[in-house]
Amino acid sequence: MDLDKPSVWGSLKQRTRPLLINLSKKKVKKNPSKPPDLRARHHLDRRLSLSVPDLLEAEALAPEGRPYSGPQSSYTSVPSSLSTAGIFPKSSSSSLKQSEEELDWSQEEASHLHVVETDSEEAYASPAERRRVSSNGIFDLQKTSLGGDAPEEPEKLCGSSDLNASMTSQHFEEQSVPGEASDGLSNLPSPFAYLLTIHLKEGRNLVVRDRCGTSDPYVKFKLNGKTLYKSKVIYKNLNPVWDEIVVLPIQSLDQKLRVKVYDRDLTTSDFMGSAFVILSDLELNRTTEHILKLEDPNSLEDDMGVIVLNLNLVVKQGDFKRHRWSNRKRLSASKSSLIRNLRLSESLKKNQLWNGIISITLLEGKNVSGGSMTEMFVQLKLGDQRYKSKTLCKSANPQWQEQFDFHYFSDRMGILDIEVWGKDNKKHEERLGTCKVDISALPLKQANCLELPLDSCLGALLMLVTLTPCAGVSVSDLCVCPLADLSERKQITQRYCLQNSLKDVKDVGILQVKVLKAADLLAADFSGKSDPFCLLELGNDRLQTHTVYKNLNPEWNKVFTFPIKDIHDVLEVTVFDEDGDKPPDFLGKVAIPLLSIRDGQPNCYVLKNKDLEQAFKGVIYLEMDLIYNPVKASIRTFTPREKRFVEDSRKLSKKILSRDVDRVKRITMAIWNTMQFLKSCFQWESTLRSTIAFAVFLITVWNFELYMIPLALLLIFVYNFIRPVKGKVSSIQDSQESTDIDDEEDEDDKESEKKGLIERIYMVQDIVSTVQNVLEEIASFGERIKNTFNWTVPFLSSLACLILAAATIILYFIPLRYIILIWGINKFTKKLRNPYSIDNNELLDFLSRVPSDVQKVQYAELKLCSSHSPLRKKRSAL
């Protein structure tokens, strides 16, 4: 008999063994009082055929402590762990006896059967079959490692006869696969499925998709339009090395494996090319290297680079026992999910953390030729950071006098692109000239005055560029929280104490944010789940968490540290749903002013909509610590506020315009009512009121001194402090909650319209947009003055009281003429002392830190209730 093939009867018994074992176990469990069946089992059940020796008998007959020296001694060595109690040699035959005090014999046999038969198969199988079994075992291990870690509860697996029996049946069935499987795929029967092992090695000469001259590539493998695997992101590299291995199950070879490469950005992903592999062309059990050329029919690049990977296709039985994998997956689901969700790659951290600040002061232009343009402005770009200067009327020497701060990354190309643009009467924009600055070539901590000639036109730009190192930003886990270390916290507190108030005035403080978790988020995917991540913004500083996949209650447990440049900044935390290569979906947002932070206390914030005016679905848990120097914060209050990066311009909205008109109307009505009150006093409509007003007027005018002006304003602060205004958030919140403000797009696609009519439409739109902005500024200015006296921001109100008290004392002891003289000398000599100083109004800079009524509504913390979700409210109403 051929030793390589089992007998038909043995094969049939081997296939039915798992079913019989399961049935016997169920009977024993149902009748525990019934004694177990101790009938002797046929000795061929442990052998493939009559010609194969009984391995258990061979070991039993061997002298104890000495290996068996028979003809098959090299194949009958069984580990000592297999010789457990309950299996003893009865005689020279192969019958076994089981003790009634031990476990059921069928369980012990099932637990040892897989090992014994595997040894037997390896002993007598042909070399080709041995390679096939070994290959299948390797891929089983790879698939197990991808599905999750090994379970940490061995009693759940070792005691399961179903699992071991199915493993034994699988190994035996794999022996019946023909040895000529590598000749081609046409000879394979239809019930087979396949496992495709992909070793993603590297990419070469990929295309540039970022402004800094590099890309952040990652790879997606798709089959039938579904994404089966997504690689990690390699940041700032056109020759990335992934070195990732993945095993994908394949049901049919009549399809193509799509390989797509994307460039990862903060909000979207750019396409970098694709390729495909025809699965039917692959050879079984053979690893082949494939160099795939990337192509994109919509791109103008001829060479988009290549992707290098190894592919290996193996065959698996179609009726594979699925519960084997489901058991392991169920046992290790929590552990594998925890490892995947808590993984934040070092490359992602490195990509977010900047190590320097580039301060650029745009002073003026010299002999700039504007041509037919009527207005001019400057755009500055460093990587994906972009600023736009204010627009000035056409001039040969335009004076901008603006300052911009960029983040500097030492591992990236530090090329600053500067463009001068012009506008004509028809609002057409045209680039007038460009110039570049290599930031890496500039010295540190030194103001560099540069006169940069423009490339494509006459003229030059004069600016100051200063590169300052920055070491206050970090991303870490909860276990390595910076402020959790008492010594480090003491050191940071000492750095921002009052004794160091005049050292590095721009370094105001430090903010630490613990992003713990979110709950009850909106389901953005069709599966009823979301892939949420958090974006934290403090001014122009942005950091983000990793993505937690398929979860509406994600736990990030990350710690973010921001350097504070302005204590009046607002921390904006936005939750997005990652959507692959598409822009992320909005899941909620919350705005937290720094001065309203309660140190060291975990807080639950109700998420709001994009306009921060209505409650959205879900909550987020944050814990924040704020350490700052009050003197530095006060000095920074009277300097120009930091400009924001260029964002999409706001479009004309009728609802926003109506809201701003109402805001201006309220301020105007307050002034009108005051004038009517004075008029009523003059007309003696009320005798008592007019008498009191007349007496106050006579006493004030007779004894008036200049110090009384700040003193009167100080008394208003005291009055409102003693009797605080009820309802910090005005009634505007009620009207805004019932109004959904959405930007409306006004498009005109009719090609038959005359140019004159189009120009008129543009002109009217510009005028209305300007009126809208002016009305908003006026309304905000009046509301900020009111909120300053209402103690809306105690820090600013206290600072104003301190300044007014000092002004009262100064005006009391120093004559007015000397004060005016000092002020005039300071104004006239300011340019002589500092030629590059930027003019500003300290009072307006102070008021810009006070929130308006709209901002008060946006920054207000909503109360957490059981039905905080508007969706639940609607459902309950139905």
UniProtKB/Swiss-Prot annotation:
**UniProt keywords, alphabetically:** Calcium, Developmental protein, Membrane, Metal-binding, Repeat, Transmembrane, Transmembrane helix
**Cell compartments where the protein resides:** Membrane
Please report a single Pfam family linked to this protein: C2
Which PROSITE patterns does the annotation name? C2
Recite the UniProt cofactor note for this protein.
Binds Ca(2+) via the C2 domains in absence of phospholipids.
Q: Where is the composition biased (Low complexity)?
A: 69-83
Function in brief? Might play a role in the development of cardiac outflow tract.
Recorded protein name is: Multiple C2 and transmembrane domain-containing protein 2
Task: Please report the organism this UniProt entry assigns to the protein.
Answer: Homo sapiens (Human)
